[in-house]
Design a protein with these regions (language model features):
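Protease zymogen maturation seam
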Residues: 60-147, 156, 160-170, 180
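Hydrolase catalytic cores
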Residues: 200-203, 223-229, 252-255, 335-422, ...
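Substrate-binding/specificity loop regions of serine endopeptidase catalytic domains
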Residues: 77, 183-184, 189, 210-214, ...
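Active-site alpha-helical elements of protease catalytic centers
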Residues: 145-148, 152, 160, 186-226, ...
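Inhibitory N-terminal propeptides of secreted protease zymogens
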Residues: 12-91, 131-134, 139-140, 272, ...
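Loop/turn elements at helix/coil->beta-strand transitions in domains of secreted/extracellular proteins
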Residues: 63-66, 145-148, 219-223, 248-254, ...
Length: 436
């Protein structure tokens, strides 16, 4: 035991972060340990030259240790993108030029899947946001006004800062509640990647401003919580802290568009997720993508989490979307469908986000597909249902979570796929928000 030291210092955490690379399934020089009689696990630093797995095995022999695990690393769940073409006008600056006021031209994912009262085009893979928006206006909570959604991700481009960062032009300053950066250990969870801004935009980007596109729950407030670094990777201990920050600061929905490696149990995150469930917070996670992952994994398989797979514009399963235990629902992730799909429609999920390599220049790239994008739709849907007359607003605690989950499942559209691929089916937010 002399080779181990309990460590909560920023210096040690930074050291662990700086050497996390794509070849690592866990942070080197660090363990997550929970001792008997203690409420929460600790980060434990290891002496130089100490092997992580060997140290974990040694600690597990101590009867005072409830668990000792590597500090596993999660990665953002975006499928491999198409190359970003700066000369393609479809990927560029409408967000900055203010020319794209009509979201329906690009956001097939929000259209209805069949003819209805709207004059808008239909999309086989759409989730009928228009009917949901009408239901919320009638309920006096347009766009899920008043609901707070925590986005645990690479950060969000939510404010201007020292000339280095800019707020996304389709976000308003009043859309955000205070967040935190558990990577940089400060109160500025700004995005250096683009993934988190894209996810946040799908959940709650502004509408009716003649600029950019729109978000599903466009009047919800966002809580940016940075738990992934500029490369889209984050440690279990900081993710658990991010979940608890969202609980303490009264989020009602938590979005987690990232995954740990296959078959890894991550008890420190599971414990935080159980606390979120008891607090009445709906937790949503991507199931992961083929290539970057090999099986549905945590947090999608965590306690009471809604695991979300990705569907395409043609209402097929995305060719990247993993199948297995933990798939609860499908939502639009865009991209190329799996083999056997009768539709060739394969557009991505369009949203305003950072240009590659920039923290202050924005575009609408045609590069984002995957279950990360799908999870964002379900988080937005949960916010809409919470604000609607489809459920009792007086619900609290675990009962609220169970009702929201049941409502989303019971109104989902069966795509005729195995449950291991589609769960209950493709979300239909129009039906999910119909008044009781």
């Amino acid at each position: 035991m002399a080779a181990l030291a309990i460590c909560g210092s920023p210096t040690a955490s930074a050291a662990a972060r700086s050497v996390v690379g794509p070849a690592h399934g866990f942070a080197p020089h660090q363990l997550v340990v929970k001792f008997a009689g203690e409420r929460r696990a600790h980060a434990v630093s290891l002496a130089p030259g100490t092997g992580v797995r060997r140290a974990a095995q040694a600690l597990r022999r101590n009867p005072r240790v409830l668990y000792a695990e590597p500090d596993y690393v999660a990665t953002a769940s975006a499928a491999d993108p198409e190359p970003f073409d700066p000369d393609d006008p479809g990927t560029l600056g409408a967000a900055e030029a203010g020319e794209l006021g009509n979201w329906a031209f690009k956001q097939w994912n929000f259209l209805a899947s069949e003819e209805g009262s709207s004059d808008l085009p239909i999309s086989p893979g759409g989730i009928d946001a228009v009917d949901a928006w009408r239901h919320l206006i009638e309920a006096g909570r347009p766009g899920a006004a008043g609901v707070v959604v925590a986005v645990l991700d690479t950060g969000v481009a939510y404010r201007n800062y020292k000339g280095r960062f800019r707020r996304s032009p389709d976000f308003g300053a009043g859309q955000f509640v205070p967040g935190y950066d558990f990577v940089g250990h400060d109160r500025l969870p700004l995005d250096e990647n683009g993934h988190g801004t894209h996810v946040a935009g799908t959940i709650a980007e502004k509408t009716d401003n003649g600029l950019g596109l729109t978000g599903l729950a466009y009047r919800a407030r966002l809580m940016p919580v940075r738990v992934l670094d500029r490369n889209g990777r984050g440690n279990a201990i900081q993710i658990a802290k991010g979940i608890r920050f969202a609980i303490a600061n009264k989020a009602q929905v938590i979005n987690m568009s990232f995954n740990f490696a296959c078959h890894k149990k991550v008890p420190v995150v599971d414990e935080a997720l159980k606390e979120a469930f008891e607090a009445g917070i709906v937790t949503v996670a991507s199931v992961g993508n083929l290539g970057s992952e090999q099986c549905v994994s945590e947090p999608a398989t965590g306690p009471r989490v809604i695991g979300v797979g990705g569907s395409t514009e043609g209402a097929c399963l995305g060719g990247y979307s993993l199948a297995g235990r933990g798939v609860d629902l499908l939502a639009p992730g865009g991209g190329i469908p799996q083999g056997g799909c009768p539709s060739v429609l394969a557009r991505p999920i369009y949203q305003v986000t950072l240009r590659p390599g920039s923290t202050k220049s924005f575009a609408i790239p045609a590069t984002y597909v995957g279950t990360s994008m799908a999870a964002a739709h379900v988080s937005g849907a949960a916010a809409l249902v919470l604000a609607s007359n489809a459920v009792k607003r007086s619900l609290k605690g675990r009962g609220r979570v169970e009702v929201i989950q049941r409502r989303l499942r019971s109104t989902a559209r069966d795509l005729g796929l195995p449950r291991t691929e589609q769960g209950a089916g493709l979300i239909d937010v129009g039906k999910a928000t119909e008044p009781r």
